[in-house]
A protein has these predicted regions:
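Divalent metal-dependent phosphate-bond-processing catalytic cores, especially two-metal-ion Mg2+/Mn2+ enzymes
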Residues: 3-10, 46-50, 62-180
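Short, solvent-exposed segments of well-ordered alpha helices
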Residues: 24-28, 73-76
Length: 180
């Protein structure tokens, strides 16, 4: 973002910045990534003849996670809802998702999320994955899944998604260097 300076990063609102502690990674900016993304779009495309920065920002807004309770965030079949579904499916159906649990866990450590969720190890994060999928994610991606079923590549993404959930639910051996 334009207002970023060495050691100071805008958090999405004009004039508001955050400093990262020594050794911090980009994961420390996770709480601000939606607002930073919207700000970047407005900086880059605001006033463009063809690209409507407000529409893009509205799509980005629905990728906010955890999903706010407001009714504006509950729609799943409009473009912003489908963008959120694509974001979630893209992360959770990634062919390498299963071996990313350790890195994701340490991002959670850096942001304090691991403490809030009670995770002490990458295995704790992995063990909680099926409940997270079924109780949190599933309701937000079904319209996206319906669209993915139209193509063979989309069906592969769906298969990846469900195979990851199945593997953890059925306690498949976990080798962080390979897939289940």
């Amino acid at each position: 973002c334009r207002d970023d300076q060495d050691g100071f990063y805008t958090i999405g609102a004009p004039g508001q910045t955050v400093t990262l502690p020594p050794g911090a990674t980009d994961a420390s900016l996770t709480p601000y990534h939606v607002d930073r993304g919207k700000l970047f779009v407005h900086e880059r495309f605001g006033g463009h003849n063809i690209i409507d920065a407000d529409i893009i920002a509205a799509n980005i807004e629905l990728t906010r996670f955890p999903v706010p309770e407001d009714s504006d965030y509950q729609e799943t079949g409009d473009y912003p809802g489908l963008v959120r579904a694509a974001d979630l499916i893209g992360q959770l159906a990634d062919p390498h998702h299963m071996r990313k649990f350790p890195a994701l866990f340490y991002e959670f450590v850096e942001t304090g999320t691991s403490i809030r969720l009670g995770y002490k190890t990458p295995g704790d994060l992995r063990d909680a994955y099926p409940a997270f999928y079924w109780n949190v994610v599933n309701r937000y991606i079904q319209d996206g899944v319906r669209h993915l079923r139209v193509t063979q590549e989309g069906k592969q993404w769906i298969a990846n998604l469900y195979s990851h959930v199945f593997a953890v639910e059925h306690h498949e051996p976990w080798n962080p260097g390979s897939q289940p």
